[in-house]
Amino acid sequence: MAPTQSKVRIHNLAEAHEKTLRAFPIEVEQNPEGKKLLVKQIRIRTLGHADHSNDSICFLNTYGFIKEAVSQTEFMRAGQKSESKNTLTACMLPFGPGPNIGSPQKMLEYAEDIKIHVRKTAGCKEQIVFSLDRTPQVFRGFQFPRDRYACVPSDKYIKSPGKLVAGPNYCYIITFLSLTFCPSSQKFKVPRPVLNFRSTRMRGIHLEIIMKITCSENSPIRKTLITDDLENGPKASVWIHLCNLYKGRNPIKIYDEAYFAEKCKQMLLSVGISDLWGPTIAVHANGKIPKSASLYFNSRGWALHPIADASPTMAKQLWSIGCEIMEVNAILQGSDYSALVDHPDVIYRKIRIDPAKKQYAHSKWNPFKKAISMPNLTDDSI
């Protein structure tokens, strides 16, 4: 029989981060030929006490579409415009952290000059390689333009990677820009090897984030959500690995569930959500961090967890729908798999939720429903 569970809830949100996350309102206009065009937009947010000083940084995230690039071997006469290729699928590509931008409103205009190629490859998993061929100066301080390429699992940033086949050249067209200003002290993403580490001498602490999803009643996404609470709407559960706690070797101490629950309480954890590397869970430890957990936080007690790493499917759903953090639980489990299956979960329900940053608001744009053709995703320079 499966082990029973007890829970501990976290009541407040991380300062400077919201419990909601807003998406882009969709605006459509017609060109002179009568075709419907999707209006490109930029969203600018400031978290906490971040301003345009030297102590704050800017996260840049992009949303758009992948299409087949125009062939460079076509014959063209003078004055003829290259024909648009069909849009294949929606895509998100985080540019990562960068310098503080003094005039962010102009970045949407400069984004039209960015040229990004998209290719498939394979390792132990199917992968997508984004390579930057051309970028304006204003973008070059961000992480992706500095690296010039990014290789990720194919399902991480692309809605339908199965539509990309061998042979054609593909490009990524940016339609939405999301800029988030935050203090530089909050920039810390836990290294993947640290997150994957397990040991028989450790107990693992995970966070379960329960989010209310704001989607329509006829949305196909509802089939993937928790719908047993009709009054409060559909919900989704996302788990992230927070840290490991050392059991210790002191024969006098009792390293039971109460001991680890007390350690969790002493950290005074708080949680919020923002658009950094895509939808990202921000965790702040306001109290005492155990020595064995120090690798999972920066010196200010912050840790950022992109949902695209923890749950790619859920992250892609949040491109087009809103969410609000309703509940956060800390779960204590055995770190080693053998200990995990033999011991029950201990769940701590007193994790704080930031009331200003607990929502990811609803958007009318839905990359999971082909409702409108978007021929404006053409660029003669591509």
From Swiss-Prot:
Where in the cell does this protein reside?
A: Virion
**What species does this protein belong to?**
Human parainfluenza 4a virus (strain Toshiba)
Keyword annotations for this protein, in alphabetical order, are: Viral envelope protein, Viral matrix protein, Virion
- Protein's UniProt keywords contain Transcription regulation: no
> Cellular component GO terms, alphabetically?
viral envelope
What's a single GO MF annotation on this record?
structural constituent of virion
The function of this protein is: The M protein has a crucial role in virus assembly and interacts with the RNP complex as well as with the viral membrane.
Q: What is this protein called?
A: Matrix protein
Q: Which family does it belong to?
A: Belongs to the morbillivirus/respirovirus/rubulavirus M protein family.
Its lineage reads: Viruses, Riboviria, Orthornavirae, Negarnaviricota, Haploviricotina
Question: Where does the protein principally reside?
Answer: virion
Q: Which biological process annotations from GO are given for this protein?
A: virion assembly
